[in-house]
């Protein structure tokens, strides 16, 4: 059995690392998107409330009173931040997918060379 050339092993290692990074990015993106949905729901509910409604913000184990305007402002800022993070992760996801595709092509090319060389060796040995 022939050993895997170091160049191919390096490609496989880089491919595996890129896949692990992609999984991490996808997980973080999913978390940001879930939190974004929660923030959007909260915004929609608070906007329905009268201006003088009592709103409380959870801080650790305490509930702190907050004005409707302050709550809306804080949620809108949080929404913007989450959207920015999700957009950044989408770009990272795209770059990683491209990198994975290129590495996959390089690996297949190297495997093709190995198979071709193995077939030539088998023919020469007959």
UniProtKB/Swiss-Prot annotation:
It comes from Pyrobaculum neutrophilum (strain DSM 2338 / JCM 9278 / NBRC 100436 / V24Sta) (Thermoproteus neutrophilus). The keyword Chaperone applies. Belongs to the prefoldin subunit beta family. Molecular chaperone capable of stabilizing a range of proteins. Seems to fulfill an ATP-independent, HSP70-like function in archaeal de novo protein folding. This is Prefoldin subunit beta. Heterohexamer of two alpha and four beta subunits. Its main location: cytoplasm. One of its GO terms (cellular component) is prefoldin complex.
């Amino acid at each position: 059995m022939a050993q895997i050339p170091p160049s191919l092993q390096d490609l496989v290692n880089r491919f595996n690392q890129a896949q692990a990074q992609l999984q991490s990015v996808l997980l973080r993106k999913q978390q940001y998107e879930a939190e974004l949905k929660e923030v959007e729901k909260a915004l929609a509910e608070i906007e329905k409330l009268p201006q003088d409604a009592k709103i409380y913000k959870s801080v650790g184990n305490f509930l702190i009173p907050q004005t409707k305007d302050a709550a809306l402002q804080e949620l809108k800022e949080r929404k913007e931040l989450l959207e920015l993070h999700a957009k950044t992760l989408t770009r990272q996801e795209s770059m990683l997918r491209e990198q994975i595709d290129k590495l996959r092509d390089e690996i297949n090319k190297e495997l093709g060379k190995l198979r071709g060389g193995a077939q030539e060796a088998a023919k020469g040995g007959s």
